[in-house]
Amino acid sequence: MPKFYCDYCDTYLTHDSPSVRKTHCSGRKHKENVKDYYQKWMEEQAQSLIDKTTAAFQQGKIPPTPFAAPPAGSAMIPPPPSMGGPPRPGMMPAPPMAGPPMMPMMGPPPPGMMPVGHGPGMRPPMGAHMPMMPGPPMMRPPTRPMMLQSRPGMARPDR
């Protein structure tokens, strides 16, 4: 009867039967060997990718990133104001970001402003979606931690 060879463990099993293979493959040493094998394989793949990227960059096939360090002796172009960073001369610093963004105010628009998408007093057509507001998505306002509810008749220790 042919023997079964385990590539991960570099060993032959006593014989090739499903029960022997199952027992071997569920063993601690086999699992460690499989984990080590794939960990080494991933490291080799990552190093190969790094080497290929470095070679392509050195050959000029990959352009430098726009905000990378400038070559020696050249002037650096400052990033746009939306990227943050220190204020430039003559500019006011940006206000600090404190707390979550404010929730939009609901109600009629200020006088002279038209509502987004529809005329005054008009509702969107049936099945139509409301238009998206520009800007970042709004966050839920912070809430108190949820209190555990007790069953009727049980004393509440927090009161």
From Swiss-Prot:
GO molecular function, one term: U1 snRNA binding
Database matches in InterPro entries: Matrin/U1-C_Znf_C2H2 (IPR000690), Matrin/U1-like-C_Znf_C2H2 (IPR003604), U1-CZ_Znf_C2H2 (IPR013085), U1_snRNP-C (IPR017340), Znf_C2H2_sf (IPR036236)
Keyword Nucleotidyltransferase belongs to the record: no
GO BP annotations, alphabetical order: mRNA 5'-splice site recognition; spliceosomal snRNP assembly
Keywords: Metal-binding, Nucleus, Ribonucleoprotein, RNA-binding, Zinc, Zinc-finger
Location of this chain's protein in the cell: Nucleus
Region annotated Disordered, chain positions: 63-95, 139-159
Family matches, as SMART domains: ZnF_U1
Matching Pfam families: zf-U1 (PF06220)
Regions of compositional bias (Pro residues) in chain numbering: 77-95
Zn finger residue spans: Matrin-type: 4-36
Domain of life: Eukaryota
Main localization category: nucleus
Ribosomal protein recorded as keyword: no
GO CC annotation, single: commitment complex
Quaternary structure and partners: Component of the U1 snRNP. The U1 snRNP is composed of the U1 snRNA and the 7 core Sm proteins snrpb, snrpd1, snrpd2, snrpd3, snrpe, snrpf and snrpg that assemble in a heptameric protein ring on the Sm site of the small nuclear RNA to form the core snRNP, and at least 3 U1 snRNP-specific proteins snrnp70/U1-70K, snrpa/U1-A and snrpc/U1-C. snrpc/U1-C interacts with U1 snRNA and the 5' splice-site region of the pre-mRNA.
Reported function: Component of the spliceosomal U1 snRNP, which is essential for recognition of the pre-mRNA 5' splice-site and the subsequent assembly of the spliceosome. snrpc/U1-C is directly involved in initial 5' splice-site recognition for both constitutive and regulated alternative splicing. The interaction with the 5' splice-site seems to precede base-pairing between the pre-mRNA and the U1 snRNA. Stimulates commitment or early (E) complex formation by stabilizing the base pairing of the 5' end of the U1 snRNA and the 5' splice-site region.
Family: Belongs to the U1 small nuclear ribonucleoprotein C family.
Name listed for the protein in its UniProt record: U1 small nuclear ribonucleoprotein C
Lineage, broadest ranks: Eukaryota, Metazoa, Chordata, Craniata, Vertebrata
